[in-house]
């Protein structure tokens, strides 16, 4: 940094009275500001700032963000070279000032032709730890994590939907603060760290987005997880209706989780208090209020650019509900960001899914599917192709069928055939949209391959290319069930051979 820039930073410190300290790859301005008494501001007061020019520093940035109100702390992420990393966090003293910063400064032209992005920062204290042995218990995982990292408060482990004595190959580790979690991630992220002889995978667990109290006050749907695969919707309706017969409007079960819709909120809250922790069919269940999906999604401008919250519509009543997913895979919840059953979890994987300009003269290099990272695949169809390719299997064939649904709708369903394995898979749901039917069929195939492969397939984040297993996940596509009328081939559709779509005759279905 040149002397003029240092002088500008010193002048800023003199004007404001704030201190400035650089540590752990970030430079902290303030925190607390002069004269501040009491604890730091609670959650919801911090904004994330992305797309900052790399040669811009606090002397230019702080005055811009002061327009929105009193700043408690400004944290600029720094490179070893002295340049910033393109993003920062600004904590205000009140929620209103943070919201004002978003309104005023999102897409603000910070320099000619340079626009920054500003959005709510989610104070993350959880890490996702993948590729752990499936026979390890919560206590063992917590003990090991406390040995290698500081500030561990809790470990969240979910049992396999197939074998409740095993975990799903991943865990969530809760730390006492975002700083403690960041330090732990920094220590574990290189990819060479091992637990029990396994190279573990580490990433941020995407924090649950806060919803306004007014929205949550209208929710009358319960989210139930940790169910046995054999538990039926009828069993759930009976169990949740015990306190008040007739209070349950409908039940939608998707593998080992379900949504219980009540006619009114009071009955839902009563059932929540009574049923949380209850054992159904030998499995202790977890019950929470279902969270409506936010209207603005999970847009963010960080180094990963986008955090894609997974939502699912259809069959869930008055509004969409947030499928809180993370790299876990279960039949109904192949989750956002290579996830699935973390439907039960308040997290989703963040994928680099922003669009960038294709510059004239750019060099194009042919690549094969082997060179693509699993984290770059966001659909079950792509992941199934990837999985087959990695295992030297034939690529999946999609056989398309139709049936007459309710109200005369034409329903679509795919059967997935993997010839080299002599196996075929068909989901138990049908769709009205062709692409959804294909995605659902691929999800179902991935789920069944996971169930049948035992420990050979780990359902945690994408593993290094040299590892002996593959993890995967994709967006969840729950659909209302329709009576299975006689299935027949649909009308011909135009498609390229590359799509490998098959419109079979009736006999091939049997």
UniProtKB/Swiss-Prot annotation:
UniProt cross-references to Pfam families, sorted A to Z: DND1_DSRM, RRM_1
Keyword RNA-binding: yes
Record GO biological process: meiotic cell cycle; oogenesis; spermatogenesis
SMART domains: RRM
Cellular component terms (Gene Ontology): cytoplasm; nucleus
InterPro entries, per the entry: HnRNP_R/Q_splicing_fac, Nucleotide-bd_a/b_plait_sf, RBD_domain_sf, RBM46_RRM1, RBM46_RRM2, RRM_dom
Keyword Ribosomal protein: no
UniProt name for this protein: Probable RNA-binding protein 46
Function: Essential for male and female fertility, playing a crucial role in regulating germ cell development by ensuring the proper progression of meiosis prophase I.
Residue numbers spanned by region Disordered: 23-42
Organism from which the protein derives: Danio rerio
Record's keyword terms, sorted: Cytoplasm, Differentiation, Meiosis, Oogenesis, Repeat, RNA-binding, Spermatogenesis
Name of encoding gene: rbm46
Residues annotated as domain RRM: 45-123, 125-207, 220-292
Null mutant phenotype: TALEN-mediated rbm46 gene inactivation leads to female-male sex reversal during the sex determination stage and infertility with failure of spermatogenesis. The testis of mutant males have germ cells that are almost morphologically identical to spermatogonia or are spermatogonia-like but exhibit almost complete absence of germ cells beyond the spermatogonial stage. Oocytes fail to progress through meiosis to develop juvenile ovaries.
Intracellular or extracellular location(s): Cytoplasm
Matching PANTHER family: HETEROGENEOUS NUCLEAR RIBONUCLEOPROTEIN
Molecular function per GO: mRNA binding
Pro residues composition bias: residue spans: 31-42
């Amino acid at each position: 940094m040149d002397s003029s820039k240092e002088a500008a930073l010193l002048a800023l410190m003199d004007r404001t009275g704030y201190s400035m300290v650089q540590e752990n790859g970030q430079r902290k301005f303030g925190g607390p500001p002069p004269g501040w008494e009491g604890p730091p501001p609670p959650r919801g007061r911090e904004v994330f700032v992305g797309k900052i020019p790399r040669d811009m520093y606090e002397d230019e940035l702080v005055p811009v963000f002061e327009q929105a109100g009193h700043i408690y702390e400004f944290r600029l992420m720094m490179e070893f070279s002295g340049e910033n990393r393109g993003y920062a966090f600004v904590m205000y003293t009140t929620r209103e000032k943070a919201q004002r910063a978003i309104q005023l400064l999102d897409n603000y032209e910070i320099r000619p032709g340079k626009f920054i992005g500003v959005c709510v920062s989610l104070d993350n204290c959880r890490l996702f730890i993948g590729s752990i042995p499936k026979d390890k218990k919560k206590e063992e995982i917590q003990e090991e994590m406390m040995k290698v990292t500081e500030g561990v408060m809790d470990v969240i482990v979910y049992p396999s939907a197939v074998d409740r004595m095993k975990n799903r190959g991943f865990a969530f580790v809760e730390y006492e603060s975002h700083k403690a979690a960041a330090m732990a991630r920094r220590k574990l992220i290189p990819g060479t760290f091992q637990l029990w002889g396994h190279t573990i995978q580490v990433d941020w667990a995407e924090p649950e987005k806060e919803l306004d109290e007014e929205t949550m006050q209208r929710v009358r749907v319960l989210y139930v997880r940790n169910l046995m695969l054999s538990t039926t919707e009828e069993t759930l309706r009976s169990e949740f209706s015990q306190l008040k017969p007739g209070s349950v409007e409908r039940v939608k079960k998707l593998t080992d989780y379900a949504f219980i819709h009540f006619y009114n909120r009071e009955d839902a809250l009563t059932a929540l208090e009574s049923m949380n922790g209850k054992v159904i069919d030998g499995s202790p269940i977890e019950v929470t209020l279902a969270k409506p999906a936010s209207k603005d999604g999970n847009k963010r401008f960080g180094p990963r650019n986008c955090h894609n919250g997974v939502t699912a519509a259809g069959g869930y009543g008055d509004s969409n509900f947030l499928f809180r997913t993370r790299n876990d895979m279960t039949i109904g919840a192949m989750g956002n960001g290579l996830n699935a059953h973390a439907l039960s979890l308040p997290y989703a994987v963040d994928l680099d899914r922003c669009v960038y300009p294709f510059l004239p003269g750019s060099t194009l290099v042919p690549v094969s599917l082997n060179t693509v990272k699993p984290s770059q695949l966001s659909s079950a169809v792509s992941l199934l192709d990837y999985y087959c390719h990695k295992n030297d299997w034939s690529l999946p064939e999609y056989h398309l069928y139709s049936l007459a649904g309710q109200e005369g709708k034409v329903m679509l369903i795919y059967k997935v055939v993997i010839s080299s394995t002599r196996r075929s898979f068909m989901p138990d749901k049908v769709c009205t949209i062709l692409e959804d039917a294909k995605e659902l069929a691929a999800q179902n195939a991935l789920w069944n391959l996971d169930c049948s492969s035992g420990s050979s397939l780990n359902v945690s984040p994408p593993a290094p290319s040299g590892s002996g297993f593959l993890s995967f996940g994709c967006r969840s596509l729950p659909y209302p069930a329709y009576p299975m009328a006689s299935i027949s081939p649909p009308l011909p559709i135009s498609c390229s051979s590359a799509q490998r779509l098959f419109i079979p005759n009736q006999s091939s279905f049997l």
